[in-house]
Structure formats: C-alpha cells, structure tokens
Amino acid sequence: MQIGIIGTGPVGRAFGRALPALGHQVVVGTRDVAQTRSRPEWSDSGLELVPYNDLSSELFILVTGGDGALPALAAVGPALDGRVVIDATNPLDFSRGFPPSLSVCNTDSLSEQLQRAHPDARLVKMFNTVANEVMINPPAAGADSTLFVAGNDESARAAATELARELGWSDILDLGDLTAARGLEMWIPLWVRIYGQLGKPEFNLKIVR
C-alpha cells in the first residue's frame, strides 16, 4: 500500500522506519523539503520527501504536533478526499509551560475539528495514546497492551486496525464514532504525568476483560 506520512517529527520518523519494512511504499509530506532533508534523521532515510500540497496516497497518517494538524491537512487538500486519514496527534497546549494542557476537550476534540474541516476524508483516531516507539513496536511497552481506534466510518476503522495488526498490535479496542477521540485525547495529560514518574515513555494501558 502507498502510505503518506504527514509530518516529520519523531513519530513520522518512526513510521518511516517501520512501514517500508512491512512492504509499504512510503511518501513523507513536509512543509520544507530542503530543511527536512538537511536533518540527520531524514538525510539518509531513503524515503521520498514532498511538499504537503504534492502529497497523495492511498492512506495517510497524520503525525504533526497538535497545533500543526489543521494547517497540514489544509495544505494536503483534496488529496485527502475519500482516503483513510489516521490521526495520531494530540491537542497539546504548552503556552503556560509544562506540563501541557489541552487546547480542546470535553465537548470537542482535535480529531472532530479535522473531520469537520475535511468532511470527505475518512478520519480515524489511533496511535495517539502511546509513545512513538510503542506505536510501531507494541512489545516495547513491556507487555501486551491495548490500542484504541475511533472514527465515523466503519470501513476506515477496519483499514486502520489492519495496519495496526501488521505493526504487531493484537489487542485493539474499537470505540465507535469519532466522539470517542475526546476521551483518547484527554488521556494524554495523565500519560505525561506517568511518563514523568516512570522516567520513560514506553508504557501503555491494558484493558482487562
């Protein structure tokens, strides 16, 4: 499958390593190709880098910072129409320092804002509840754990779930429509606190039935 990664931070680089190893063709969208290529983690990646507005793919994974998510999707534009867009972002607000708060919560979510801005895209919330290394290598959390998926389009959730299984996830809990993204994003302030106590980001939740 051709997969477009939207964003070039640590999460984008993690997916850029993992997905080609699974046989996927990966193209990476960035605001500035030359600047991105000059960074050591991308200079020898072997991946195609293109401006956001030239990015097209069968499936997209959005991995920008939360404040860059809406502008990034706006730049990609109509190429998103009809495509599954996995949203791995969180609406973190660092304006008052650390720990961050959420720029949106309770009655709305960043994912829902993205879906409203791009009604023809098939938004799926997934991967935002774990660190980048755990996203692509679930055993890095130290034990079997749970990944969550939410979205308004059932077939889009199924496509995202299939990709997660390719990455090694076996326990994937479907939470239904995109309003569930509110809770998934609201987990992150607690995740940040736990990270501070453990001193490492490789941990996760396990839903025991």
Where does each model-flagged region fall?
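Active-site-lining helix/loop region of Rossmann-like oxidoreductase modules
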Residues: S145-R209
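Rossmann-like NAD(P)-binding element
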Residues: A34, P40-V84, N90-G97
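Short, glycine-/small-residue-rich phosphate/pyrophosphate-handling segment
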Residues: C105-T129, I136-N137
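NAD(P)+-binding Rossmann beta1-loop-alpha1 motif at the extreme N-terminus of oxidoreductases
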Residues: M1-W42
